[in-house]
């Protein structure tokens, strides 16, 4: 944050940003200026232009960076190397670690499988999965493919899952057949039949 404050003080000297409080004040009072600068400064990979920052009004009518297109997976997977990108800790299996290089390879593999299944940009994919590394890989592959993601934890009631997924009409469903909670194996196969 100190580096960004220094950047802002040089780029916008008339805003007198010198510390956290003045940065916060600037970001609220001049939010369009702040967000436009932050988008470029942050190094987020995007296509388009950072102007305008905001269009429309009201909760449903407002568009944030309407001329910007970005891909979540592209931004998260741009880091290379063997440092840990993803760690999974579970009571049901050994702890897992996945490097950035391995994560990119796994996401690419799943993305290719999605294309082989006929998934196209804008298609919807749902997941009935817990918070495990495989879920992260699936959501990144979905994003990389340009598809839309929705998920529910397997501890949701069946009707709640059906209600959510019916709204988006997914073309593909990622799921688990069970999970472990407090040492107890929870079988999800009957829920899957209903889904």
For the regions a language model picked out, list residue spans one by one.
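A short N-terminal helical cap/helix-turn-helix that marks the beginning
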Residues: 28, 36-50, 66-87
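Structural core segment of the AMP-binding/adenylate-forming
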Residues: 144-195
